[in-house]
Amino acid sequence: MDSEDIPDFSSLKEETAYWKELSLKYKQSFQEARDELVEFQEGSRELEAELEAQLVQAEQRNRDLQADNQRLKYEVEALKEKLEHQYAQSYKQVSVLEDDLSQTRAIKEQLHKYVRELEQANDDLERAKRATIVSLEDFEQRLNQAIERNAFLESELDEKESLLVSVQRLKDEARDLRQELAVRERQQEVTRKSAPSSPTLDCEKMDSAVQASLSLPATPVGKGTENTFPSPKAIPNGFGTSPLTPSARISALNIVGDLLRKVGALESKLAACRNFAKDQASRKSYISGNVNCGVLNGNGTKFSRSGHTSFFDKGAVNGFDPAPPPPGLGSSRPSSAPGMLPLSV
């Protein structure tokens, strides 16, 4: 306190009271300051303890954060290495995939070319198939015709068998007629000596006409006829059936000639049928080879039609050599084709 602030006292009591009052005032302020100091110290201690606790927590947190930071650094390093490794692998995979893509594109181009070639080949094969189908239909049609013709010829063959039976029966009848003719000639020789001359001449003329008609075969007769039909001179005396009239004998011989001519025609048809069957078998094998070649080359095979309508005559029918038929027994047989083998009955 400055000396200028001290007032002037009139008495000692006033000065003493002033200083007492001033000391009390300072004492009170000191007490308040000390209380405030104590409060401040207590508050500072509490604050210091709290700050120390916060510091400990902060240090612990800092250590944890540092540990986390270090761990994260390690993880970052590991991730960097892993990323670099993955990047290298992905780069290798991308390069491999690019190579595969280029190869795949090349293969795709080749496959496109191959598909186009296959389509062209398929078109060629379809055309060849259509041509082959047409050829096979034609062949089947001709084969069906041949089958029908074979069936017809088989029916004719059956008819020929029945005719052969009839021919054999007629041959037997002709042999009997020849035997009867021989007996009749002998009887006429006997009666010629005893009868007058004019009736004998008439009988001789009639018998010579009948013998001439019997000596001429109804079919072409060859060397085998001499063995099959014995001549009247070679037949010994025997007992025949009842004698027939000359007209009946001539009609019977005409029937035999017609039957033999029919048998010859049937045998020629049978030979033609056999040759046709052989020709069809060889043609079928030839056609199968040509069809396979046509499928490979894309061209259908065209088959030429050849009609097997010609009849083949035999060199000898039932052992007879070909000879012109006698007049009055019908038209002659069709001409025979060369190289045909005879069929024996």
Curated annotation (Swiss-Prot):
Coiled coil: 28-190
Region (Interaction with YWHAE) location: 189-256
Region (Interaction with CENPF), start-end ranges: 175-345
Chain segments carrying region Disordered: 315-345
A GO biological process held by the record: vesicle transport along microtubule
Region feature Required for localization to the centrosome and interaction with dynein, dynactin, tubulin gamma, PCM1 and PCNT, mapped onto this chain: 256-291
Region (Required for interaction with PAFAH1B1): 114-133
Post-translational modification: Phosphorylated in mitosis. Can be phosphorylated by CDK1, CDK5 and MAPK1. Phosphorylation by CDK5 promotes interaction with KATNA1 and YWHAE. Palmitoylation at Cys-273 reduces affinity for dynein.
Keywords of the record: Centromere, Chromosome, Coiled coil, Cytoplasm, Cytoskeleton, Developmental protein, Differentiation, Kinetochore, Lipoprotein, Microtubule, Neurogenesis, Palmitate, Phosphoprotein, Transport
A single Gene Ontology CC term: kinetochore
GO molecular function: microtubule binding
Residues found modified as Phosphothreonine: 219, 245
UniProt key word Isomerase: no
Biased composition (Low complexity): 329-339
Segments of this protein annotated with the region Self-association: 56-166
Region Interaction with KATNB1, residue ranges: 64-189
Matches recorded under InterPro entries: NUDE (IPR033494), NUDE_dom (IPR006964)
Origin superkingdom: Eukaryota
Main location: cytoplasm
Annotated family: Belongs to the nudE family.
Function text: Required for organization of the cellular microtubule array and microtubule anchoring at the centrosome. May regulate microtubule organization at least in part by targeting the microtubule severing protein KATNA1 to the centrosome. Also positively regulates the activity of the minus-end directed microtubule motor protein dynein. May enhance dynein-mediated microtubule sliding by targeting dynein to the microtubule plus ends.
Name assigned to this protein: Nuclear distribution protein nudE-like 1
Native organism taxonomy: Eukaryota, Metazoa, Chordata, Craniata, Vertebrata
